[in-house]
Amino acid sequence: RPRTDWAVGTTIYPAGSLLAATYHEFLAGTAELSVVFEPDEHTSLEDYAWTRDHLVLVTLVDVASRVEVVTPGSWERAPIAGIPPKTNTVLVDVDEYGDEMFLDSSGFDFPSRLLWGLAGGEVTEIKSAPAFFDASDIEVTQNFVTSADGTMIPYFVVGHHGSAGPSK
C-alpha cells in the first residue's frame, strides 16, 4: 500500500491503493500488479486482513465504514451483509487458517457490538455493550456541506425522529 504515488513503468498507482502480486514474480521483478483498491475523493482504505480464502477490506466512504470481502484472482468485491449503514466498523481479528472474522461495529444510535461471521457470509451479533439511553426514537442522517474550495464535507445529524430544528 503506497503512501505516495508510485510509478511502475508507465502506470502510476495513487497513494493509498492496495495492490496484489504473486510473491515470487514480485521478487523477480516480473509481476503484474493487480489493483485491489484505489482511493477516490470519497473513499479511503481503513484496514484489511487475509483469511484463508479471502481478503477482508474496511473502507471509509464519506467517513462511514464499508466492509467488503474480496476474492483473490478475480479481485471481485462484495459487501458483507448485516452491517448497518452510517457506522464505524473495525476488524477485530480474522482466522488466517479459516474464513472466520470478528468485527466491532458501533453507531450514534447503538452501542459497540461484536460481530462474527464467515468471509463471504452474513455477520451475527454475539455480544453488545450496554445501551446508556433509549435510541428507539433516534434518527441519524448524513449530509454534506461545501467548503470554500469546493470540497464536499460529510457530517451527521443525530436527533429524535421527526424533530425540527436548525440542523434539519
Task: Label every model-predicted segment.
Residues 11-15:
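Short coil-to-beta strand junction motifs in C2/discoidin
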Residues 21-27:
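Short helix-loop-beta junction
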Residues 1-3, 7, 18, 31-40, ...:
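Non-catalytic accessory segments flanking enzyme active sites
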